Amino acid sequence: MNKLKKYLTKENITITIVLLVGTIISSVFMFKQVYNGIDTAYHMSRIIGITNSWKAGDLLAYIHLNTSGYGYAMGFFYSNLFMILPSILYMLGMNIILVYKIFILMCSIATVITMYICTKQISKSKYAATISAFLYTTCSYRIITLVVKAFVGEILSFIFIPLIILGLYQLIFEDTKKWWIFTIGFVGILNSNLVMTEIMIYISAVFVLCNIKKIIKDKGRLKGFIKATVLALLVSAMFWMPMIEQLIKSTFHMKDGMNMYRPTWWLLSFGDLFNGLMKLGTQITPAYGLGFIFIVIAILRLAIKNEDAQKLKFCDISILAGLVLLLCMTKFFPWKYLKTLGGMIQFPSRLEVPAAAFFSIASGMICHYLTEKKTILRRIIFGIIIIYQIGFVFMCIKSCEDALIEVELYRGLDSVYIDENFEYDICDGMYLPEGANVQSKLISHGRHEEKKDKYKTNNSECNFKYAKNGLKVNISFENNKEVNTYIEVPIYYYYGYVAENPENNTKYKIEKGDEGVIRVYLENSESGTIQIYYKTTIVQKLSIIITIVTLLGIIICVKKSA
């Protein structure tokens, strides 16, 4: 009770209310219906695919059981970790739209918390942390990502980027014993989105290179980076090891898919960098700036003098980092000479996520130092920011809705909203096996597979029957008098599928056939039974062991230190 009274101060209650308002305002767009953004159906399909895989007995769900029944290897390249809870809710019978709403709301809560923690530890100011968290959670790019783009990988990345920045700050400038923050940040972002992970690796590398002398001189800082990196890899082994195995053993449509993306198509004019509102047109994937409020607060930095040099130094670094990232979204950055890098990050707008984080941290710190010991001014600035940002969020949502209405006919949609009967969406189909001939149609710039069961053989004399359950197929065949007879089944081939006789464990050769599906050779068998299923590989088993052992080790170490 005493602890509760200690917490329930006027200041803490105000902070809680403001952050709660920020969380609700950033999620207000889905109080009624959810907009059918670019990837809304795609990520809802992930939830459905994982649930279907679980129901079929596949707990790892590396290959999602989709509506076509062919299977789609989403789980190898898009971690299932943060989709576990939504998938459980959906499996328990909750409406998929409601599940998605709960997921987005949880992301908003987590986002406001991580940015508050980040700025609080850097600035040692609750005031700065509150402003940073509020601006970050309600920044226009995040609203556009939530409403129009529905890029869940970026939405999740908003949560973990503040932790990566805080980890960098602790390891380079302050307490090296807090290296584990860097680990948490990278484990989170690796399980959120591979492209955002790549971007944060580049940003972290720049920070390290700019401070390399300091890091090399202080062995504690160097050891901290090594420990943080190794631990992040060990904890995340269950995701990245199976992914790398697939990339080595199989070929995917992503090689062609990468050619679909050119950063030069999505660049902004310099004047739009801080616009923060959607523009009408058929292209709804470019960046649209962070919001004018960030540049206003950044200019106020010039009015601060003779304060904590170290804290102001990081504030200035944050402003510089944010500006550089924004400039990368303009024609001033030489994307035409960096086609490989551009193809990997797909859209320069992704750089707005870390840019928003840096500007939010700097904004909170500037407001803190500018109004320190000036209570009335502090309250006025605080109030102006809250009122302005709330109004701007509603303007941003309205611009998003207008843009979706404008593009509705272009996308062939019946409504700007999505309903629970949406069609299963695999987006650009980048994780299909190479050669897959998808019977598809354009849905939110993505591919939808039509349900079909197509079995075929190169031996018309061979008779066979089949029974399919999920991503498992049982085949009974007879009258095979040819040596090279094969049967193709309607399941996409990914490394790990096996074919064997369930009675005597005889193995049958299996490979990728026409249109990327599984082809099994009957070889010299005149008749028999074949069971085709996905078998957990040695690498996958090893990765699970590494992750579990590492997590157990962390628990033991934490208990001992406590």
Model-identified regions with their sequence ranges:
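Membrane-embedded transmembrane-helix bundle of lipid-linked glycan/lipid transferases
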Residues: 1-402, 531-533, 539-562
